[in-house]
């Protein structure tokens, strides 16, 4: 008899293997699957495993030239999603040999490359990935990580403060540098290029880099603190991006920035390697993430994009505020904040963490809280994010009625007051407003900020629920 039989057969015969014991070297994925009406969940889960590994839509004779059992993805468990009709979590195990070492690009091309357009599925979302130790070890990861950054900046025991320079588009380089200087002089640790500031006609990158470097050095000399500005090196080509990073290094500034989703993982990993080799910190902005992660039943959850960034490399990444103008539910946000910072994270479904993740000492990433936050949020932010974070107030600094430097002073005073109160054992969640009010008695800048923003709230329900 001939070993090869042409024709189309059910995926579940080959790719649904509930008896499979996962290996320590497997990459594990949890997908939220919404099958088309009439498609059984086992078939849908198996289809995902097949299409994201070795399968194709029909039997091919070349299957006989390899060992499918060694290379195929396997759907090893399926569970219904509580409270949702015809939605399932499908767990898929991928053998390590399917992936190129040290390439987030290849990992994503395999796992989420083709399968999301699959007709048998109404919707598909990648909820979480377990990256095995053996694969983690093929990545450099963040250029420096949390501890090295603190040592470089000589700042300990508190969150770091930042500010995005606004208006984000239209300032000349000289005026932009002036705004940077005012913020840093007032007491911020960092200022930031907006994610869409690259090199436009009103402000070319080289001019901006130069004036920002001048602002940094002037502010450092006046305050005796180390300062930084996230110089956005994102560009249309990798060569141009590297040219900008090299110029930043020549200026002697401490940190550059990249938009990792629009710039792409290949560019990001290249830049991260350069940053480690040349002592630059790397700030990562997640522009475009909501296109991918905001829909509850289709796309990729941000915790996966956050894990991917830790592998590709970045020292800071924007990760929601829980309290400001942008999306973020508290437990889920803290779940991926832990995935960014900690070395070992236990599985915890209540926070959306589907797998235990061991990073085997890959450096951690500082989460950046940014978007619609101001001094009244400071106690909550200090309590939620703790010391290892960057709190970024754009409008919450520049919108101060007396200008940028007083806005920066207000934020720094509020932060120091919250850290001191916490260290004295006070409850920031309960006494937060009182702590800010007390501090504003001896800081007119803070008092003015408190007055301006006392009524501002962004109250909408979070979409990112379990």
From Swiss-Prot:
Annotated site residues (Transition state stabilizer) in this chain: 325
Names of required cofactors: Mg(2+)
Residue positions where N6,N6,N6-trimethyllysine is found in the record: 5
Keyword set, alphabetical order: Calvin cycle, Carbon dioxide fixation, Chloroplast, Disulfide bond, Lyase, Magnesium, Metal-binding, Methylation, Monooxygenase, Oxidoreductase, Photorespiration, Photosynthesis, Plastid
Primary subcellular site in the record, as a coarse category: plastid
InterPro entries: RuBisCO, RuBisCo_large_chain_AS, RuBisCO_lsu_C, RuBisCO_lsu_C_sf, RuBisCO_lsu_fd_N, RuBisCO_lsu_N_sf, RuBisCO_lsuI
EC number: 4.1.1.39
Coiled coil: none
Cofactor comment text: Binds 1 Mg(2+) ion per subunit.
UniProt GO BP: photorespiration; reductive pentose-phosphate cycle
Assembly and binders: Heterohexadecamer of 8 large chains and 8 small chains; disulfide-linked. The disulfide link is formed within the large subunit homodimers.
Miscellaneous field: The basic functional RuBisCO is composed of a large chain homodimer in a 'head-to-tail' conformation. In form I RuBisCO this homodimer is arranged in a barrel-like tetramer with the small subunits forming a tetrameric 'cap' on each end of the 'barrel'.
Protein's job: RuBisCO catalyzes two reactions: the carboxylation of D-ribulose 1,5-bisphosphate, the primary event in carbon dioxide fixation, as well as the oxidative fragmentation of the pentose substrate in the photorespiration process. Both reactions occur simultaneously and in competition at the same active site.
Protein name according to UniProt: Ribulose bisphosphate carboxylase large chain
Organism of this sequence: Berzelia lanuginosa
Name of the gene this protein is made from: rbcL
